[in-house]
């Protein structure tokens, strides 16, 4: 049985700012773009979250909820330096590390001899070491599979951890809401609830063939996760090539204004996700995806050096006009392709 740890730093960007400037610790702060430039919030500290300020929220809305919010532009070199230090701490315990972003990673400690092989104690020691060396707090989840470790890391935030032992998995899954499973969004959760499926325990009683007919390959993933099955390895060679966000509508849309409004809502989340893996927002390409009511889909991309909302909207409009053919649209997606590290190095050297 594997021993997987998911480590997730607590409000990472904001925590670095509070560490380096203690005067910020007890006041609401957020990292994000200015209201004048229609920026979005990347991270907010816990005092700000008490006012409802959240990641991916437009800065203007955040300031309405919390007028005395201290807005910081972000110091991504400092965040990267802290992230590298955290990664080095992980490497003291295992070489099997899969970074997901600057502030979270999976660790496979199945074969680790540290702490007498106890994943629970390893997670505790890693969190304590991070605090001792960086004065930052982390939360962790421990489980036999990746998706449960990720869910567990959110159970006792901030500065806590949660353990799901192999023996506890069946009982934990019985009452686990499907919306907690990574990849199950609001629309999917609503469709599942309409079918009477609210928890993993409900899905365990379902026929796999029915789920496959209704949801395609997602149906298999849903069934497997509900059984506690997740055979994905912690991939230390993992190199993220793209970042995306999409929305499946409860009802098909037929007017460009509806599509544009969805893009306006999706863009802040894309920006937030990209900032977690690529703080400078430099990219190779960006593009849009539309899926139609006949389940055909189309993707169109542009070579573009930096994330740009105006270009995404223009690309989507061109795709809407030229490829829709009068069909309803059931899904709108935005994505970026990241620069190849070797190409990025050449660009930097060229400067």
Swiss-Prot record:
It is found in: Cytoplasm. SUPFAM superfamilies: DNA/RNA polymerases (SSF56672), Lesion bypass DNA polymerase (Y-family), little finger domain (SSF100879). It comes from Escherichia coli (strain K12). Keywords: Cytoplasm, DNA damage, DNA repair, DNA replication, DNA-binding, DNA-directed DNA polymerase, Magnesium, Metal-binding, Mutator protein, Nucleotidyltransferase, Transferase. Changing residue 103 to A/N: Loss of function. This is DNA polymerase IV. It comes from the Bacteria. The catalytic core consists of fingers, palm and thumb subdomains, but the fingers and thumb subdomains are much smaller than in high-fidelity polymerases; residues from five sequence motifs of the Y-family cluster around an active site cleft that can accommodate DNA and nucleotide substrates with relaxed geometric constraints, with consequently higher rates of misincorporation and low processivity. It lacks the O helices present in high-fidelity DNA polymerases in the fingers domain. Monomer. Interacts with beta sliding clamp, which confers increased processivity. Poorly processive, error-prone DNA polymerase involved in translesion repair and untargeted mutagenesis. Copies undamaged DNA at stalled replication forks, which arise in vivo from mismatched or misaligned primer ends. These misaligned primers can be extended by Pol IV. Exhibits no 3'-5' exonuclease (proofreading) activity. Overexpression of Pol IV results in increased frameshift mutagenesis. It is required for stationary-phase adaptive mutation, which provides the bacterium with flexibility in dealing with environmental stress, enhancing long-term survival and evolutionary fitness. Changing residue 49 to A/F: Loss of function. GO terms for cellular component: cytoplasm. Belongs to the DNA polymerase type-Y family. GO terms for molecular function: damaged DNA binding; DNA-directed DNA polymerase activity; magnesium ion binding. Changing residue 132 to S: In strain: ECOR 34B1 and ECOR 37UG. Changing residue 176 to F: In strain: ECOR 37UG. Mg(2+) binds at residues 8, 103. It catalyses: DNA(n) + a 2'-deoxyribonucleoside 5'-triphosphate = DNA(n+1) + diphosphate. GO terms for biological process: DNA damage response; DNA synthesis involved in DNA repair; DNA-templated DNA replication; error-free translesion synthesis; error-prone translesion synthesis; SOS response. Residues 4-185 form the UmuC domain. Binds 2 magnesium ions per subunit. The lineage of its organism: Bacteria, Pseudomonadati, Pseudomonadota, Gammaproteobacteria, Enterobacterales.
């Amino acid at each position: 049985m594997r021993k997987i740890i998911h480590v997730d730093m607590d409000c990472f960007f904001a925590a670095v700012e509070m560490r380096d400037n203690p005067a910020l610790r007890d006041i609401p702060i957020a990292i994000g773009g200015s209201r004048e430039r229609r920026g979005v919030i990347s991270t907010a500290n816990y005092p700000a979250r008490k006012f409802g300020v959240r990641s991916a929220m437009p800065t203007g809305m955040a300031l309405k909820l919390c007028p005395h919010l201290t807005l910081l532009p972000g110091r991504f070199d400092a965040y990267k330096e802290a992230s590298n230090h955290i990664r080095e701490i992980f490497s003291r315990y295992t070489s099997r590390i899969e970074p997901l972003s600057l502030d979270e990673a999976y660790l496979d400690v199945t074969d680790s001899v540290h702490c007498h092989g106890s994943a629970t104690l390893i997670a505790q020691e890693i969190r304590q070491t991070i605090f001792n060396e960086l004065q930052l707090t982390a939360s962790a989840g421990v489980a036999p599979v990746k998706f449960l470790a990720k869910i567990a890391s959110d159970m006792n935030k901030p500065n806590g951890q949660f353990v799901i032992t192999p023996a506890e998995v069946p009982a934990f899954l019985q009452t686990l809401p499907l919306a907690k499973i990574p990849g199950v969004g609001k629309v999917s959760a609503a469709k599942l609830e309409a079918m009477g499926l609210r928890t993993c325990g409900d899905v365990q009683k379902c026929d796999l063939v029915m789920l496959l007919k209704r949801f395609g390959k997602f149906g298999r993933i849903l069934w497997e996760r509900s059984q506690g099955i997740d055979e994905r390895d912690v991939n230390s060679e993992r190199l993220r090539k793209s970042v995306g966000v999409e929305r499946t509508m409860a009802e098909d849309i037929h007017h460009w204004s509806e599509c544009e409004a969805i893009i306006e809502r999706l863009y802040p989340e894309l920006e937030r996700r990209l900032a977690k893996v690529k703080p400078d927002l430099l990219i190779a390409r960006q593009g849009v995806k539309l899926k139609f009511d006949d389940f055909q889909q189309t993707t169109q991309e542009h070579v573009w050096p930096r994330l740009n909302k105006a270009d995404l909207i223009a690309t989507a409009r061109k795709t809407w006009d030229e490829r829709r053919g009068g069909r309803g649209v059931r899904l709108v997606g935005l994505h970026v392709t990241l620069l190849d590290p070797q190409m990025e190095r050449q660009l930097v050297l060229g400067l």
